[in-house]
Amino acid sequence: MARVKRAVNAQKKRRTVLEQASGYRGQRSRLYRKAKEQMLHSMTYSYRDRRARKGDFRQLWITRINAAARANGLTYNRFVQGLKLSGVEVDRKILADLAVNDAAAFTALVEVARAALAAAPEPTAA
């Protein structure tokens, strides 16, 4: 049986890892073993943070909406409740964009929410 020489494959594997690790500091971009370990961590972090990014953006949007709503005299909770009662279906991403870039439109939405809250019956304490 013929002998299998793996030099080409091994070199290719090492070169691939070192290319992926270019830009890292010190040994992590120059030594194969350190670069491989760093790449394992990097891939784990990127996988985790792609999922965490969604929650981070939602948190940012809610913070922006809350700040703009409070500037107009409503809390975030009451504002969203009023929008739901009035049947306005605008997501938080768009609301945050309006709060930052179009204050007049956001103020109009606050007035719609305020009117819906005023028209809704107050919940009674049980």
Swiss-Prot record:
SUPFAM superfamilies xrefs: Ribosomal protein L20
Assigned keywords, A-Z: Ribonucleoprotein, Ribosomal protein, RNA-binding, rRNA-binding
Transmembrane intervals: none
A Gene Ontology BP annotation from the UniProt entry: ribosomal large subunit assembly
Covalent S-S links between cysteines: none
InterPro entries in the cross-refs: Ribosomal_bL20, RIBOSOMAL_L20_CS, Ribosomal_protein_bL20_C
GO cellular component assignments: ribonucleoprotein complex; ribosome
Superkingdom per UniProt: Bacteria
UniProt GO MF annotations: rRNA binding; structural constituent of ribosome
One Pfam family this sequence matches: Ribosomal_L20
Family to which this protein belongs: Belongs to the bacterial ribosomal protein bL20 family.
Function: Binds directly to 23S ribosomal RNA and is necessary for the in vitro assembly process of the 50S ribosomal subunit. It is not involved in the protein synthesizing functions of that subunit.
Name of the protein in question: Large ribosomal subunit protein bL20
Species this chain originates from: Frankia alni (strain DSM 45986 / CECT 9034 / ACN14a)
Protein encoded by which gene: rplT
